[in-house]
């Protein structure tokens, strides 16, 4: 690989790192909101809201199409995030 290509890759990776930092900040904000909602839940069976999950995924698909983003990719990302937050809520609920 040429020196120029290596430099281009490094520059692009630095941009990705900046985006990753922004994503981490958003995850922190999202987690704070999840914590606020979790504090209102009285029963463990309130953690998984299948209807809400379905609506979220439908909206993400629609928005992804509008932005010309691969809908399979965004579906997988959101599905993974939802699973992660469900596990997070279950873990935190046990400590209530």
Predicted regions and their residues:
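Domain-level signature for soluble enzymes in the chorismate/prephenate branch of the shikimate pathway
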Residues: 1-96
């Amino acid at each position: 690989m040429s020196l120029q290509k290596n430099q281009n890759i490094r520059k692009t990776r630095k941009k990705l790192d900046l985006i990753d930092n922004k994503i981490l900040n958003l995850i922190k904000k999202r987690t704070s909101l999840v914590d606020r909602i979790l504090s209102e839940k009285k029963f463990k069976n309130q953690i998984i809201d299948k209807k809400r999950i379905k609506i979220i995924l439908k909206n993400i698909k629609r928005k992804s199409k509008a932005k010309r983003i691969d809908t399979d990719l965004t579906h997988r990302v959101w599905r993974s995030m939802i699973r992660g937050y469900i596990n997070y809520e279950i873990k935190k609920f046990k400590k209530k």
